[in-house]
């Protein structure tokens, strides 16, 4: 998620290292930095000589490139240029951005259009977009006008001779990809590490984690899912991952209070912040992008529908529902395989 929901990563201690030196054989190395309004962290258990200074530069270059594609906060990003271009003609996009949008459209369709990447205007009027946070609740008229600029049926992803295009039929429609950004970036960092021949690592960007374990290493990565509270870092459950991605979305951290609690996840159907009984959703899959898309879509659906779709789609999901002060947890059969008893 673009809005940070921290996943506690056991033994992920951020230490100072001299990354300009070539590291010794079998050394564990930590790299970290900032991107997309959150932190990124990479832990590598390496069994060959590698210059980590160069690797960190590659990671930072990729993250900068991703930000220049998808960030609504970057006025010159590809998606910002699409939003500013008030035309209904097809606009060229690259293959990576097309893949990101295709996942958004797919999961959007499967979640009854609740995951809606065209909700940029709605997100802005509620103060969670690149514009300044507002200190007043938008009027019903403002919400209605924003909804008129929203809808997955108003965009098309086109392919012509291996060239990708994105088209909107409402000139002022605004795309916001913040719900998918961390997963998108994490998958791209995975590709970099794989290309470098690194086969034992994990990557963390905000609330999304990607793990890879060497065939020679029988130990899986142990990940702790946080209990959904506003302040405490208490562990809710532990999962064991080998070559997987996990993403968590929640309603308990990114919000502001104005007469009532205003959460960052906006329901495009009502035009208001989501009124959901779910406080946390965690999804495990092979793709960080897919996990990142599904966790937000499911939280918008609410417990009953999220459970139904998780079963239908055979998703590895942990749903945490709150009733007053009591938390109720449901895990799908696929998720149970990763749980540490």
UniProtKB/Swiss-Prot annotation:
InterPro entries, A to Z: ApbE (IPR024932), ApbE-like_sf (IPR003374)
Signal peptide: 1-17
Keyword tags: Cell inner membrane, Cell membrane, FAD, Flavoprotein, Lipoprotein, Magnesium, Membrane, Metal-binding, Signal, Transferase
Keyword tRNA processing belongs to the record: no
Reactions catalysed according to its record: L-threonyl-[protein] + FAD = FMN-L-threonyl-[protein] + AMP + H(+)
PANTHER family: FAD:PROTEIN FMN TRANSFERASE (PTHR30040:SF2), THIAMINE BIOSYNTHESIS LIPOPROTEIN APBE (PTHR30040)
Protein name from the UniProt record: FAD:protein FMN transferase
GN (gene name): apbE
């Amino acid at each position: 998620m673009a809005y940070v929901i921290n996943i506690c990563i056991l033994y992920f201690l951020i230490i100072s290292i001299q990354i300009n030196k070539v590291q010794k054989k079998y050394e564990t190395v930590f790299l970290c930095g900032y991107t997309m309004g959150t932190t990124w962290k990479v832990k590598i258990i390496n069994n060959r000589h590698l210059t980590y200074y160069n690797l960190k530069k590659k990671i930072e270059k990729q993250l900068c490139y991703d930000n220049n594609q998808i960030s609504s906060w970057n006025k010159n990003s590809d998606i910002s240029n699409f939003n500013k271009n008030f035309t209904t003609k097809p606009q060229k996009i690259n293959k990576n951005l097309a893949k990101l949008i295709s996942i958004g459209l797919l999961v959007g369709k499967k979640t009854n259009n609740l995951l809606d990447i065209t909700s940029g205007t709605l997100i802005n009027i509620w103060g969670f977009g690149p514009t300044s946070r507002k200190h007043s609740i938008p009027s019903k008229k403002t919400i209605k006008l924003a909804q008129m600029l929203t809808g997955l049926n108003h965009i098309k992803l086109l392919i012509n001779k291996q060239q990708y295009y994105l088209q909107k039929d409402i000139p002022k429609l605004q795309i916001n990809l913040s719900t998918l950004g961390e997963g998108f970036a994490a998958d791209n960092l995975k590709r970099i590490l794989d290309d470098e021949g690194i086969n034992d690592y994990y990557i963390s960007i905000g609330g999304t984690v990607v793990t890879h374990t060497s065939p020679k290493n029988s130990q899986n990565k142990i990940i702790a899912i946080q209990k959904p509270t506003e302040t405490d870092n208490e562990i809710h459950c532990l999962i064991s991952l080998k070559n997987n991605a996990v993403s968590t979305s929640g309603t308990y951290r990114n919000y502001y209070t104005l007469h009532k609690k205003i959460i960052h996840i906006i329901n495009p159907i009502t035009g208001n912040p989501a009124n959901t009984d779910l406080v946390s959703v965690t999804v495990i899959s092979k793709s960080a992008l897919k996990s990142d898309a599904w966790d937000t879509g499911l939280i918008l659906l609410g417990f009953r529908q999220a459970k139904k779709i998780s079963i239908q789609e055979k998703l590895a999901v942990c749903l945490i529902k709150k009733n007053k002060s009591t938390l109720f947890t449901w895990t799908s059969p696929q998720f149970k395989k990763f749980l540490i008893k």
